[in-house]
Amino acid sequence: MKLLYFAWVRERVGVESETRDIPTNVTTVGALKTWLASIDEGYAYAFETPDIIRVALDKTLAEDDAQLAGAGEAAFFPPMTGG
């Protein structure tokens, strides 16, 4: 799966994008955040408060219970403000 990181999430993980093989037991957005947090210290720092990180699957906003099946891309970004 292609993974994209934006803003401070990108700064903390240290890469803009990457492609990773996702374990078969990681089936939801929430599980993906948890798995990514286990990779190393940078990922753990980026995902230390996973509930505030927004995720888009194939450019569509997704909640933590969204299924990953069929998705080719996940983008991670901090909350946005308008104005």
Which residue stretches match the model-derived regions?
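Ubiquitin-like/PB1-type beta-grasp interaction modules and other compact soluble beta-rich domains
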Residues: 1-82
